[in-house]
């Protein structure tokens, strides 16, 4: 009963923080947006710990990287901070993919499934990169390409796990797809279209949903 109450309380806190953050994005309230952004991952990590029977240090490490990435991306228009944010999220994705890989491998996926799941998200990431490559600073082009492929591998690993019947893989796949959507919107906003409140809301709505679904999926696994 205490566990249920804790999950309920943390869910309510995460929803409240998320709603406040999205409202701040939509209204252009920068101080409130920055403050609430740094609350999101600690709340999601706490919710994961409350839901999981045995929380994985690998998943918690990935969530910490997400929190660090959130901090750096507040200042995304400074090239050094953008690079640091990509590095933090990239490391987080490596940890996420590693943990999903363990779940997927245990379910013994078929080779064809693994190949198909790898090619489709990878093609999406490559398309986004080649559309934007001339607008991306030269120093960030290779890291950006590698980051996109790493992000695609998150969805690939989750799909492999889903087809193989791994527990929680449906949530992980949905989270991986939303992560790709979020970062795709962010890439266009940063390198082509310029900032807008609507784009900020879209980026953060899909990002929050992605991280929450990953937390639920990992807790189920």
Model features per residue range: what roles?
Residues 2-221:
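Polytopic alpha-helical membrane-helix bundles and their juxtamembrane interface segments
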């Amino acid at each position: 009963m205490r566990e249920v109450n804790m999950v309920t309380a943390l869910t309510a806190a995460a929803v409240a923080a998320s709603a406040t953050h999205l409202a701040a994005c939509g209204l252009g309230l920068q101080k409130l947006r920055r403050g609430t952004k740094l609350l999101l991952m600690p709340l999601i990590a706490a919710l994961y710990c409350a839901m999981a029977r045995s929380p994985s240090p690998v998943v918690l490490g990935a969530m910490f990287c997400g929190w660090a990435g959130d901090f750096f991306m507040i200042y995304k228009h400074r090239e050094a901070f953008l690079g640091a944010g990509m590095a933090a999220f990239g490391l987080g994705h490596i940890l996420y993919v590693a943990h999903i890989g363990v779940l997927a491998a245990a379910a013994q996926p078929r080779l064809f499934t693994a190949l198909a799941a790898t090619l489709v998200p990878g093609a999406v990431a490559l398309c986004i990169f080649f559309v934007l490559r001339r607008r991306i600073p030269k120093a960030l082009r290779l890291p950006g390409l590698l980051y996109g492929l790493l992000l695609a591998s998150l969805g690939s690993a989750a799909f492999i796990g889903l087809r193989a019947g791994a527990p929680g893989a449906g949530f992980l796949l949905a989270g991986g797809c939303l992560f790709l959507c979020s970062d795709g919107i962010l890439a266009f906003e940063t390198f082509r279209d310029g900032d807008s409140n609507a784009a900020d809301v879209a980026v953060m709505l899909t990002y929050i949903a992605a991280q929450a679904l990953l937390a639920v999926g990992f807790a189920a696994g």
